[in-house]
């Protein structure tokens, strides 16, 4: 008898300072700890690269659960504030895309696991605020 493993979408991060060996191309990645954890509990992990928020519905329809990993700070404009602390540690494209994933996962009644930044982003997507 074959048991189907749940498909777990792990939202990717992006490294933009890849260096000369990659020709200054951005690299999409998931930290291996997230992938191993999903596998350890019997899930089949797939990476969801940062992209157009309009594609969130399609991505979420392909998975059983969504994992949002840690990473950069959430940009203040997503929780209704003006940036008071200047930082290069924002990825607004990622913020917008993952908020779309969260909203769509809620619409499709798919479970969401947020770790660190991921949990902060769930809070923001649901109308919450953060301290800068």
Each predicted region: which residue ranges?
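Catalytic nucleophile loop
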Residues: 119
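N-terminal beta1-alpha1 cap of cysteine-dependent amidohydrolase-like domains
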Residues: 1-115, 123-126, 131
């Amino acid at each position: 008898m074959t048991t189907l493993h749940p498909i777990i979408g792990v939202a990717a991060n992006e490294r933009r300072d890849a260096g000369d060996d990659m020709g200054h191309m951005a690299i999409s990645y998931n930290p291996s700890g997230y992938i191993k954890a999903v596998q350890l509990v019997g899930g089949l992990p797939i990476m969801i690269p940062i992209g157009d928020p309009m594609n969130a519905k399609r991505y979420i329809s392909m998975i059983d659960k969504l994992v949002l990993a840690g990473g950069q700070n959430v940009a203040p404009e997503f929780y209704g504030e003006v940036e008071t602390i200047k930082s290069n540690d924002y990825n607004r494209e990622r913020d917008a895309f993952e908020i779309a994933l969260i909203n769509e996962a809620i619409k499709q009644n798919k479970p969401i696991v947020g770790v660190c930044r991921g949990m902060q982003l769930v809070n923001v997507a649901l109308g919450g605020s953060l301290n800068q």
